[in-house]
UniProtKB/Swiss-Prot annotation:
This is Serine protease HTRA1. Forms homotrimers. In the presence of substrate, may form higher-order multimers in a PDZ-independent manner. Interacts with TGF-beta family members, including BMP4, TGFB1, TGFB2, activin A and GDF5. It is an enzyme of class 3 (hydrolase). Its EC number is 3.4.21.-. Pfam families: IGFBP, Kazal_2, PDZ_6, Trypsin_2. Keywords: Cell membrane, Cytoplasm, Disulfide bond, Growth factor binding, Hydrolase, Membrane, Protease, Secreted, Serine protease, Signal. Serine protease with a variety of targets, including extracellular matrix proteins such as fibronectin. HTRA1-generated fibronectin fragments further induce synovial cells to up-regulate MMP1 and MMP3 production. May also degrade proteoglycans, such as aggrecan, decorin and fibromodulin. Through cleavage of proteoglycans, may release soluble FGF-glycosaminoglycan complexes that promote the range and intensity of FGF signals in the extracellular space. Regulates the availability of insulin-like growth factors (IGFs) by cleaving IGF-binding proteins. Disulfide bonds join C37-C62, C41-C64, C46-C65, C53-C68, C76-C89, C83-C110, C112-C130, C119-C155. The gene is Htra1. Residues 365-467 form the PDZ domain. SUPFAM superfamilies: Growth factor receptor domain (SSF57184), Kazal-type serine protease inhibitors (SSF100895), PDZ domain-like (SSF50156), Trypsin-like serine proteases (SSF50494).
Length: 480
């Protein structure tokens, strides 16, 4: 824009100058000679344009023959040739010359139609696109590589245009930028048998809820692991201690010792969540720090009894945001950056669930009370699976998505088998359907949970594809 003002001012001074500063020979200030265009354009009768066209080749005033265009800043609009590629003839006063306007026409200047700077492949910043194109033509004349446009704006790190669409409407990116520093990657280690060597066995995500290092995650992420390591967004790693676990609700609290204050995430009110709201799931799947998925809330009250997730008194948040093993334990947030749930499991494509933030608040309050009073808790039996109750409608939906899904309409559908657990050792696999244990029929996932509490050995019959397989699993006792 500054260049345009300068160019127009130069033209004005040129037109108001003394007679000694006349226009080029043969060009009058007004009443230019009429350009006579042929009735029909015959390109074969056009003179070949010069090979050296610094302003680029353009069509003549009749739109027929190729000619060399005038350079930026050249006089135009009278008897001169047309402006070069990307340039337009700007007349500060009066009207430009045209096929119908000649006598009252005024001279103008060739000005670039694009006024913003651009960065070229030669790492130079050009005032506008036209100057870059001129530089590219000069480079090609010298048999050098052409200069191409790398980006709008100056080379190097520029400032984002506040009026751009991506600045106005990228609200998801704003949320991620706000919450990412408080999201952590969790790595789990276990010692090899008959060896002191430790190996990573699983990973997950979590989020910081206190400035002194308290972190919330899923219970299944940290349960039954010898050592827990936490990595912050800046790459710093810390050993973590497990402070409290509610294996039934699948919530855990761990703690790292960190000097200074840590960024934290605040809990929102999941009771105020509405179906259709945008949500963002963030975590570290496959050990990739802060991978983001987005979606909407499908329903806010998917009952625990319906899902069979071992907590019949809790309603889960269902979302189509992608949740997997890696971002399990990470936060599900609203557009205000408030945590409204913990990413907990994916059933199939487009169907994932999160533990509501109101349940997290209850867990944190009860955990505080337990630690303040020094209460002890009894051990719980654990086999290491995540499951849901299978209904006829859910079975039909899964069969539509997976052709090899077992031909059953009830039972406990295994969503995940956690590595290095009794379930894995016994031979259970994802997508198995438990149909009986110790001779008792299994209709829901709650049936499995009840038997685990009572029995020391589980003789299971599972439907895998079209086969019934007998599997023995021995639960182990763990700290809750």
């Amino acid at each position: 824009m500054q260049f345009l003002r300068t160019a127009l001012l130069s033209l004005l001074l040129l037109l108001l100058a003394a007679p000694s500063l006349a226009l080029p020979s043969g060009i009058s200030r007004s009443a230019p000679a009429a350009t006579v265009c042929p009735e029909h354009c015959d390109p074969t009768r056009c003179a070949p344009p010069p090979t050296d066209c610094e302003g680029g080749r353009v069509r003549d005033a009749c739109g027929c023959c190729e000619v060399c265009g005038a350079l930026e800043g050249a006089v135009c609009g009278l008897q001169e040739g047309p402006c070069g590629e990307g340039l337009q003839c700007v007349v500060p006063f009066g009207v430009p010359a045209s096929a119908t306007v000649r006598r009252r026409a005024q001279a103008g200047l060739c000005v670039c139609a694009s006024s913003e700077p651009v960065c070229g492949s030669d790492a130079k910043t050009y005032t506008n696109l036209c100057q870059l194109r001129a530089a590219s033509r000069r480079s090609e004349k010298l048999r050098q590589p052409p200069v191409i446009v790398l980006q709008r704006g100056a080379c190097g790190q520029g400032q984002e245009d506040p009026n751009s669409l991506r600045h106005k409407y990228n609200f998801i990116a704003d949320v991620v930028e706000k919450i990412a520093p408080a999201v952590v990657h969790i790595e789990l280690y276990r010692k090899l048998p008959f060896s002191k060597r430790e190996v990573p066995v699983a990973s997950g995500s979590g989020f910081i809820v206190s400035e002194d290092g308290l972190i919330v995650t899923n219970a299944h992420v940290v349960t039954n692991k010898n050592r827990v390591k936490v990595e912050l967004k800046n790459g710093a790693t810390y050993e973590a201690k497990i402070k409290d676990v509610d294996e039934k609700a699948d919530i855990a609290l761990i703690k790292i010792d960190h000097q200074g204050k840590l960024p934290v995430l605040l809990l929102g009110r999941s009771s105020e969540l509405r179906p259709g709201e945008f949500v963002v799931a963030i975590g570290s799947p496959f050990s990739l720090q802060n991978t983001v998925t987005t979606g909407i809330v499908s329903t806010t009250q998917r009952g625990g009894k319906e899902l069979g997730l071992r907590n019949s008194d809790m309603d889960y948040i269902q979302t189509d945001a992608i949740i997997n093993y890696g971002n399990s334990g990470g936060p599900l947030v609203n557009l205000d950056g408030e945590v409204i749930g913990i990413n907990t499991l994916k059933v199939t494509a487009g169907i994932s669930f999160a533990i509501p933030s109101d349940k997290i608040k209850k867990f944190l309050t009860e955990s505080h009370d337990r630690q303040a009073k020094g209460k002890t808790v009894t051990k719980k039996k654990y086999i290491g699976i995540r499951m849901m109750s299978l209904t006829s409608s859910k079975a039909k939906e899964l069969k539509d998505r997976h052709r090899d899904f077992p031909d059953v309409i009830s039972g406990a559908y295994i969503i995940e088998v956690i590595p290095d657990t009794p379930a894995e050792a016994g031979g259970l696999k994802e997508n198995d359907v438990i149909i009986s244990i110790n001779g008792q029929s299994v209709v829901t996932a709650n049936d499995v949970s009840d038997v685990i509490k009572k029995e020391n050995t589980l003789n299971m019959v599972v439907r895998r594809g079209n086969e019934d397989i007998v599997i023995t699993v021995v639960p182990e006792e763990i700290d809750p």
